[in-house]
Amino acid sequence: MRDFIRKSKADGKTKMIFDLRGNGGGNAILGYDTFKQVYPQAEQEPFGGTRFRANDALNQAGKITQDFLAGKTFAQSNATVFTEAFGRGVTQDDIFGFTSSFNYQHTLDANNKVFRSWEQLFGPDEFNNDTFTTTLRYNYSDSISTTYTGFSVIGFGANLNETKTPQPFQAQDMVMLHDGMCSSTCAIVSELLKNQGAVRTIAIGGRPQPGPMQGIGGTKGAQVFSWDDIQVRMQAVFFLGSPAQRTQWNNTDLGRTAFATQLFTRSAYQGGRIAGGVNLKDNLRQGDASKTPLEFMYEAADCRMFFTAPMISDVTQVWKGVVDRMFKTEGRTMCVEGSTMDKTSVSGGGQFRGGDGKINPFAGAATGNGSRGSNNPQQFTGAAKGRAEERVWWVVTGLMMMGMMVM
């Protein structure tokens, strides 16, 4: 993507469309990196706040992992005991990988500070008579957090010097194209681009009626775990214990999760692997005092358009429709009736609107216009005139799979 952006700038392109239609997501860290590709400044660090539900099984797993990191578990008492627990060929590095989700040392708090212990991470915090962990953030400088060996998010690790790269496009010169089929990592990057970047959204399709439309219709959860992934991780934690501990854990949620059977009997399978899974992490908006998961927030696009017959056979007609509505002076008049200036959209002043309906005007890093999020609606901007109009856009599509198209 970095090469794509550099080429687009070298070719004199002035606008960018993120075509996120039909995007079911992918590796979460790519969503954060995508944001940094267009906002490389050091002060533009993606928030990406998440949390777990604070239940007993998670707490037990975190405590045992904390003991494992300190070399205090029964399985670490000698090599024979470890082999009896996990079998030949399994190393402590392997177990370190399986328990990484419960490792307090490889995540940061809401203020980008390290956790001193599992207990500090776990909390719990109480909201609406339910309990959750404290807010968690990725440590983008930590390879355990980024999941890809040798991969560095723009502005961190091997790409630290990228913070000196000029921002390739201003917020008003970028737009996201949605069709309702956006979930998971797609929702993550959309949240960052909208609320930290002030990038507007246009939605296409929907029911044949006037009014606004949400661009994101899929899950807005921060991370999904398959059933078998959860079970393997819990088993790794379980077998770190002594025989007496395991007997005790068998009667707890930890043991019941590690050795669940009925769930696997009833679930569908795909490619020889269980198809079921669960979203284990909420995605939280920066500055939202209510800490409402994004899953429960309504977010209308800044504009909406219907499909036309030419768009069905020619995708460039879709992109042209985006340009006409989002980058031209009178573009808003071409949007579906009643679909503009919704209070939850960027142009309607909804940047950083929390689940309680309140806006934190000081949340987040600087926007693409060099100012922090505010209550002032961002108006639709006019297109460049003359020759500039001929070089109006690049299109990025299939973002989470990192496939790209240009025109």
Identify the meaning behind each predicted range.
Residues T381, M402-M407:
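N-terminal signal peptide
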Residues M1-G382, G386, R391-G398:
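C-terminal "post-core" interaction segments
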